[in-house]
């Protein structure tokens, strides 16, 4: 999703990446969904840490997912067991909505990054803000180098910040938001 426009985790060694399709792929938060991407290079068998993939599975006639599926053991188990046991199958309408959102994802990702950086810079210089948490905010040279390496197109649009004051100050702040809204 948006993360892959900004950083490509599998290229940097991640074996599994989990995306929230709700937040960025759809673009409007109207549909709930997620995506699991497996790099396909991890040796599930040799690590000795994943018996649910390497040992015989009684619900699948004793097959071992690693023996039957090799590098695709994890994703096959997700499809075979998770979908069967939880019904986590996306509906046709949800699929359509996510596909519509994918058409504008790259443009939205650019705008998300631009807008987030403006807000992050504003908050980072605001006297009522204690600290801003975003990959672009650092004085440490090694952190700046990592930011440049891993986020050449920007550090994303998700950030947090701490305001100065007590719980009432925080409540008053939330009640007076105009640019953002609290959805939780």
Question: Which residues are covered by each model-predicted region?
Answer:
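Conserved PLP-enzyme active-site core in the AAT-like
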Residues: 3-125, 133
């Amino acid at each position: 999703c948006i993360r892959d426009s900004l950083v490509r985790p599998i290229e940097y060694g991640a074996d599994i990446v989990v995306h929230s399709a709700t937040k960025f792929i759809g673009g409007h938060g109207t549909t709930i969904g997620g995506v699991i991407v497996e790099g396909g290079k991890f040796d599930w068998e040799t690590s000795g840490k994943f018996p649910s993939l390497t040992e015989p599975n009684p619900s699948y006639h004793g097959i071992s997912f690693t023996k039957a599926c090799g590098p695709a053991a994890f994703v096959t188990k997700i499809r075979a067991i998770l979908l069967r046991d939880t019904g986590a199958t996306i509906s046709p309408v949800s699929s359509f909505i996510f596909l519509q959102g994918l058409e504008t994802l790259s443009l939205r990702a650019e705008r998300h990054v631009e807008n987030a950086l403006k807000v992050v810079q504003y908050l980072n210089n605001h006297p009522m803000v204690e600290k801003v948490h975003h990959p672009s905010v650092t004085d440490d040279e090694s952190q700046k180098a990592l930011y440049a390496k891993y986020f050449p197109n920007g550090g994303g649009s998700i950030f947090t910040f701490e305001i100065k004051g007590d719980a009432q100050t925080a409540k008053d702040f939330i009640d007076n938001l105009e640019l953002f809204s609290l959805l939780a």
